[in-house]
C-alpha cells in the first residue's frame, strides 16, 4: 500500500471515539444502517463491521434473521464497545439513530486516537503482506 493510496481511502483524518452501547441500542443502530434508503441509492452512511459480528438481514421482513457476535446472540442489556470517527460521533442521531445523551448514560466516552489514519498506517507498517477473505459478516436477503 502506498501512502497516497491510504490518504485517498481515508481523506478525513478524524479522531476515533469509543462508545459503550447496550445490545438493544446496537441492534437499533444496525437496523438504522440497514434501512431501505441504504439500498435505494439515497445518501446514507455505511460502516465497517468488526470481525466476529455476523448479520443476516431480511429486507422483506425488515428484520435480522441472525445477529451474533463471536457466535453468540447480542444480549439486550450487555454493554458493547463501538468505535466511530469524530464526524460520525458528531452526528450520532442522524447516522446511527442514537443520541449522545443515551450513549453517555452507558459510561464515559473515550478518545482512542486523535488520528484514524495514523492507527491504520501503524497497523499496515507492522502487519505486512496481509491477505483477505470474505467472511460474510453481513448477508442481505431479499
Provide a role label for each language-model segment:
Residues 1-142:
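Catalytic centers of hydrolytic enzymes
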